[in-house]
Amino acid sequence: MTLSQAFILTKNKQKECRAAAAGSPTLITLCVGVFALFLAALKIFDLGGGAALVLLILFFCLLFWLSSKSVDIDRAQNEYNEFYKEVFVRALIGEIDESFTYSSYGGISQSEFNAAGIYRPSVFHSEDWICGVYNGVKFSLCEVISHEREYPQVNNKYVAAFVLLKYAFDKYSDFKGSVLKCEFNKKFHGKTVAVSKDFNTKFLGEKELLDDIKFNENFRVFTTDKIEARYLLTPKFMGKLNMLKAYKNTLKSPSAAFMDDKFYLFCFSRRNFFEGRLFERLDIAEARREQRYVRQMLSVIDELNLSLELYNR
């Protein structure tokens, strides 16, 4: 199926799901507005007890209707999002390379994430899993979505302030973004990580300084094999990571890991890619931007191939 065909089908599905949600946020806003006007009239014109009773009945009716409508909207949103991923996103990925496979669920495991040691351990799920072979390299690309942590409900204002600070710290520290994993026909003897210099990334341990001054300003390098690290982190590859670091787009703070004969690239992002939004206009230009995101991540493999060719010599 072409992307244009998928676009038409998805747009029709969006209309169908909006209709199932019975008018949606616009209708809800209208009803709430009518109720607010009635309440204002009661206050301004002092309409008395009878009108107050009618207002109270209207309030409970509106409350009941809103709760039932919320369920309808959630159901319609989930149905549309599932269709969006299975039809539109699958066609979008297929247009990049028809041999690539896409699944709305799956990706990096918890053990792999923790083994990299770049970010602190957190509970997450992986989604939007793209797999394939690019320029002779087997890869997988996915999104990591951190689960919300639980916080106690407290009455003490000082404890509440601390909990609020903890919430803000966790929001910033827990990784959310994209992970690219590549498998090369090359054994790595040690573990090498190049960590973006950010507050929420690894900073403890012996650091290795390389010849690229700009790279040293942007990244912290930790390795168990100093000689291998210099073969892997070639000037061109360091330049590629510097370029990714400088990008002012949705992908930020790239960090890389060479371990267990695999390469991992972590890019922090608050944006959730490949999501169908029921009450937003379906935009083909937005789809093209998400294609560019995939191609941008895969472009790292080109520099990696050159690095490993030099290493094999």
Where are these regions (language model features)?
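Central helical "cap/lid" subdomain
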Residues: 157-162
